[in-house]
């Protein structure tokens, strides 16, 4: 059975993609065939191949499967704003059915699928749909990325409570040092470990420049997630 996880963050710009790449690397190092999925992305750039989003490209690069870009990122928008706003402006509605169809396709190929959301837990995708709604519909275990900075404790606890109130399992959380560690950094981490009702998967240190190929998976320990910690190398599979 395919392992599936949904990555959300305490806010936007907290390093969800960096953490997602690290998670994919760690799962690959454990021997799993992996696929990263960024179903909705904004702030994309036009290339000769069409609109491309840097976060989605990073997930594509760190997947062990050879994935087509469209399989990783079915909805991509140029304007760097909330998805529900830009999709409405362009007349391109984001449909839950399309998100789920893309997930089914990856599940059919990969053993370990990581879905990265956009923004925070309640990011709206339309007037009637949020990322939280879709993750709940899919019953995806959640991994929370905490951008360690002033205010993160409150944001992290509120997000964790919202995930649990949706009936989903908070599978683990990652501390991502989005600013150079301050004087009370150790106390922040200790408080988060005490207050968050989920396993601590590791801390990604302050990294000024992180490329998609950067080796960052070693910062995380997936053993608390369960079966993803064991080696399960699969046979070669075709590109999606």
From Swiss-Prot:
Listed cofactors: Mg(2+)
Record localization: Cytoplasm
Positions of transmembrane segments: none
Binding site for Mg(2+): 17, 55, 116
Keywords, ordered alphabetically: ATP-binding, Biotin biosynthesis, Cytoplasm, Ligase, Magnesium, Metal-binding, Nucleotide-binding
Annotated EC: 6.3.3.3
GO molecular function, one term: magnesium ion binding
Residues of the active site: 38
CDD domains, A to Z: DTBS
GO BP annotation list: biotin biosynthetic process
SUPFAM superfamilies named in the record: P-loop containing nucleoside triphosphate hydrolases
Binding residue positions for ATP: 13-18, 55, 116-119, 176-177, 205-207
Binding site for substrate: 42
GO cellular component terms attached to this protein's record: cytosol
This protein's pathway: Cofactor biosynthesis; biotin biosynthesis; biotin from 7,8-diaminononanoate: step 1/2
One protein family per Pfam: AAA_26
Catalytic activity: (7R,8S)-7,8-diammoniononanoate + CO2 + ATP = (4R,5S)-dethiobiotin + ADP + phosphate + 3 H(+)
Family: Belongs to the dethiobiotin synthetase family.
Function: Catalyzes a mechanistically unusual reaction, the ATP-dependent insertion of CO2 between the N7 and N8 nitrogen atoms of 7,8-diaminopelargonic acid (DAPA, also called 7,8-diammoniononanoate) to form a ureido ring.
Subunit-structure text: Homodimer.
Descriptive protein name: ATP-dependent dethiobiotin synthetase BioD
Organism listed in the record: Pseudescherichia vulneris (Escherichia vulneris)
């Amino acid at each position: 059975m395919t392992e599936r996880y949904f990555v959300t963050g305490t806010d936007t710009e907290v390093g969800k993609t960096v953490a997602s790449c690290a998670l994919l690397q760690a799962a690959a190092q454990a021997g799993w065939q992996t696929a990263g999925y960024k179903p909705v992305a904004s702030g994309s750039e036009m290339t000769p191949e069409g609109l491309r989003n840097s976060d989605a490209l990073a997930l594509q690069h760190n997947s062990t499967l050879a994935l087509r870009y469209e399989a990783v990122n079915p909805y991509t928008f140029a304007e760097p704003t909330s998805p529900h706003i830009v999709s409405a402006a362009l007349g391109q509605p984001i449909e839950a059915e399309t998100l789920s169809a893309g997930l089914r396709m990856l599940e059919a190929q990969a053993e370990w699928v990581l879905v990265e959301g956009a923004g925070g837990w309640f990011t709206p995708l339309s007037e009637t749909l949020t990322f939280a709604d879709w993750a709940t519909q899919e019953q995806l275990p959640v991994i929370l990325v905490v951008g360690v900075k002033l205010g993160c404790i409150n944001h992290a606890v509120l997000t964790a409570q919202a995930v649990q109130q949706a009936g989903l399992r908070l599978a683990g959380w990652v501390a991502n040092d989005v600013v150079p560690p301050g004087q009370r950094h150790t106390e922040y981490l200790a408080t988060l470990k005490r207050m968050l009702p989920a396993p601590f998967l590791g801390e990604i240190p302050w990294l000024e420049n992180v490329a998609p190929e950067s080796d960052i998976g070693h910062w995380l320990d997936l053993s608390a997630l369960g079966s993803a910690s064991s080696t399960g190398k699969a046979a070669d599979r075709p590109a999606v």
